[in-house]
Every structure is written in structure tokens, then in C-alpha cells.
């Protein structure tokens, strides 16, 4: 029962995201989104997070303090697509932008890049509506590759040489950024030839 409104909020937001992608495809004969992943935290994960934050373990506390119970990850092709999708989502009048963090413009010290937005999404009841937060992470394919590898090699491991890992992942982030830049330039060049 606790998860139900978060699922409804995520479903509502997924409709908006799919409309955005379809409209973009129709208007520009292109589409910014490669794929979309969704997840809802398990009860155990929610309770663990409340415990870690030393908060009371109940529905009301979780609702008031956790903004990542429902999450959507949007994987785009290029950085410009990430910003386009983020701007479009912020324009929807039925959504509330609660918080945003641009880790593309200002990557985390370890090299992590992504655009995070916490959106308040309306959930309608018979005689009222209530907003539930959905964490939206928007990143490119190369940013997602970096994050997936970092999660697999460092985050999930207990025996890590942090200094070496940090250096390798910073270099990896730079190489991926260069690859993405070259591919974007190639795409733009090809679009000019077609146009």
C-alpha cells in the first residue's frame, strides 16, 4: 500500500517522458532518448536508508524525508539531449521541480556525471491530489557506462585500492567524454549533409 502512490507517480511521469520523446521524433525526425529504466526501492531498502539516517522507521517519515523511493533513469545519446529532456520536464505545469543537481557541468570528484531532478508528481485521489517525489537521473550512454562500471568495480567491492581506482576512473571519464564529443560532431556533420 505504501509503494502504490509512488508506482502511480512513476507511471504518470513515464507517460510524459514517452510523449516528449515521440513529439521530438515527429518534430525533428530524431529522438533524444535511447532507453528508460525504472525502479522502486524495496521495503528493506527504505527501512535501511531510514536507519542509516537515524530516522523513525514509518510511512510518514519515509514520505517526508526520502526523495528517491521511486526512480527513473533516462539514457540519452548526447549531452545536448540530456539538457533538452531536463528542460522539457521542467516545463510541464503539472510537475513540480523540487530539486536539481547538474553533475555534468560540475562532475563529482570521482568523475561521476549525470543530471538529477527530483520532480513532485501528482497522484490523484477521488477528491484530492497529492504530490510524490520521483528521482529522475538523465545521462548519456557514455555516462551510464562509466557509472555502471564504477558501481560494479568500486561501489560493490570491499577491497579497493581507492587511489588507483580514482585515477583510472577519472581517465576513463575523460576518454569517454572525448569519444562522445567525436560521435556528436560526426552526427552534426551528417545532419548538415542531409539537410
Predicted region positions:
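Charge-rich, low-complexity segments
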Residues: 1-67, 177-180, 187-195
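Long beta-strand-rich cores associated with HINT superfamily self-processing modules
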Residues: 63, 76-183
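Terminal, regulation- and interaction-focused segments at domain boundaries
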Residues: 69-75
Amino acid at each position: 500500500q505504501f509503494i502504490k502512490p509512488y508506482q502511480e507517480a512513476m507511471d504518470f511521469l513515464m507517460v510524459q517522458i514517452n510523449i516528449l520523446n515521440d513529439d521530438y521524433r515527429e518534430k525533428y525526425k530524431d529522438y533524444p532518448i535511447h532507453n528508460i529504466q525504472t525502479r522502486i526501492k524495496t521495503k528493506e531498502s527504505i527501512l535501511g536508508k531510514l536507519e542509516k539516517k537515524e530516522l523513525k522507521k514509518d510511512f510518514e517519515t519515509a514520505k517526508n524525508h526520502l526523495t528517491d523511493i521511486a526512480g527513473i533513469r533516462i539514457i540519452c545519446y548526447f549531452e545536448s539531449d540530456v539538457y533538452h529532456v531536463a528542460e522539457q520536464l521542467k516545463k510541464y505545469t503539472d510537475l513540480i521541480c523540487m530539486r536539481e543537481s547538474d553533475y555534468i557541468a560540475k562532475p563529482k570528484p570521482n568523475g561521476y556525471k549525470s543530471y538529477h531532478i527530483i520532480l513532485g508528481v501528482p497522484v490523484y485521489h477521488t477528491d484530492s491530489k497529492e504530490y510524490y517525489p520521483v528521482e529522475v537521473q538523465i545521462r548519456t550512454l557514455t555516462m551510464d557506462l562509466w557509472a555502471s562500471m564504477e558501481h560494479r568495480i568500486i561501489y560493490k567491492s570491499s577491497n579497493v585500492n581507492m587511489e588507483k581506482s580514482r585515477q583510472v576512473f577519472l581517465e576513463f571519464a575523460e576518454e569517454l567524454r572525448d569519444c562522445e564529443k567525436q560521435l556528436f560532431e560526426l552526427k552534426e556533420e551528417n545532419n548538415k549533409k542531409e539537410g
